[in-house]
Structures are given as C-alpha cells and as structure tokens.
Amino acid sequence: MIALIQRVTQAKVDVDGKTIGAIDKGLLVLLGVEREDDSFKMEKLANKVMSYRVFSDENGKMNLNVSQAGGALLVVSQFTLAADTGRGLRPSFSGAGTPDQAKVLYEEFVAFCRAKGMPTQTGEFAADMQVSLVNDGPVTFNLQV
C-alpha cells in the first residue's frame, strides 16, 4: 500500500466541476492499493500517515504530525501509484489491487482515520477528479508498507 503525502496550505478535489472535498492546512494523501494489500497494511499505513512528523515546530524543525499542527487530511484514491514503470514506455498496472479490493481498503483507510479523530475529507473513488493544491515547502513523501 502506498501513500504519497504532500504538506499543503490548501487542497481540494473537484468532480464534474463541483468541489467534493477540501482542506486548508494539512496533508493531501494520494492512496494507491497494491494486489497483496490487506486491512493490516491499511491500518499500519494510516497510522504512519497520521503520525509522520512533517510539520515544523517552533524551532523550524519537522517535528509535528498533522494532528499536532492542527491540520486535516484530504484522501484521494490513485491506482497509478501502483504502476510498474521499470520496463518500456507504458506503465503496467498488474501489481495494482483490483477495483473492488482497492475500494474496500480506501474506504477502510478513510474510516480508520476518522475513527481516530482525524478530520478527513475525500475524493470520489474511481472518478475522474481534478486535484488542486498548494504544496507547502514543497514537502512530499512516498510512504509504503
């Protein structure tokens, strides 16, 4: 399971010209599900995303997690993160989870974060989305479990 996280000052996701999820300060989480992923990996990754210290403390050191910084999550499904780009000029998605598997784990990820008290907005699974963001830093990390 893969989460590409970006520290943002604002982010939003639109579907059919309508904003369906938006945050100010926080993390944009692009979430990719791989074929071998399960609920155990989902929980491990969700905890890592919520605990990862990428926000600056009073000394300017990356020492605060999203909750400590008063931020929120915007979680967007992105199966292309599971692409194999090692050969040729076209990505292979053979390692990506099936749509049914990915939807279940995506929804579990969101529900888990919300159950932990994390303010969480979402995109729409499998929709054609337009994601806008202001990357703060820029700060971007690729987390995998």
Curated annotation (Swiss-Prot):
Subcellular location: Cytoplasm
CDD domains: Dtyr_deacylase (cd00563)
Sequence motif Gly-cisPro motif, important for rejection of L-amino acids, location on chain: 137-138
Catalytic activity: glycyl-tRNA(Ala) + H2O = tRNA(Ala) + glycine + H(+); a D-aminoacyl-tRNA + H2O = a tRNA + a D-alpha-amino acid + H(+)
Superkingdom of this protein's organism: Bacteria
Record's keyword annotation contains tRNA-binding: yes
InterPro entries: Daa-tRNA_deacyls_DTD (IPR003732), DTD-like_sf (IPR023509)
Biological process per Gene Ontology, one example term: D-amino acid catabolic process
EC number: 3.1.1.96
Chief site of localization: cytoplasm
A Pfam family of this chain: Tyr_Deacylase
Subunit structure: Homodimer.
PANTHER family xref list: D-AMINOACYL-TRNA DEACYLASE 1, D-TYROSYL-TRNA TYR DEACYLASE
Function: An aminoacyl-tRNA editing enzyme that deacylates mischarged D-aminoacyl-tRNAs. Also deacylates mischarged glycyl-tRNA(Ala), protecting cells against glycine mischarging by AlaRS. Acts via tRNA-based rather than protein-based catalysis; rejects L-amino acids rather than detecting D-amino acids in the active site. By recycling D-aminoacyl-tRNA to D-amino acids and free tRNA molecules, this enzyme counteracts the toxicity associated with the formation of D-aminoacyl-tRNA entities in vivo and helps enforce protein L-homochirality.
Protein name: D-aminoacyl-tRNA deacylase
